Amino acid sequence: MVPVEGVAPSELTDTYHQGRSGGRIHMATDILAMRGTPVLAAAPGRIIKLANGGAGGITIYVADASGRYVQYYAHLMGYAPNVKEGLQVREGDVIGFVGTTGNAPPNTPHLHFQVMRSDANYWNGTPIDVRAFITKPGRMRN
């Protein structure tokens, strides 16, 4: 599922392969949306880390049930009221809101979304280009 309310898979662009400063590759999907748009859990899992600072700004890490994959949500404006570390989330749960924290341009609100194979460290796994796997539009769970 697209992790931003109201965004269809056809609206996603290839930001995964874009170059960044220092010769690095982005290796994530940026999803543009209005500031404050709900950010949704793309898949079920457990929130393992909430962080605020650095390049990602306000961030959420969600591990899947197997512990093999981690979803990373960055540049959030803030967390949903119920969000805390250890919380089990289901696909479509509101977990935060699109923003511009961290190194995001202040006039370009977006969600920086990344899925990683959880290698030695949850925050530094092997990134996966998830666009081929995102087949459902972002819709809040009732």
Where are the predicted features?
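Surface-exposed, glycine-biased beta-strand/turn segments
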Residues: 1-58, 91, 100, 128-142
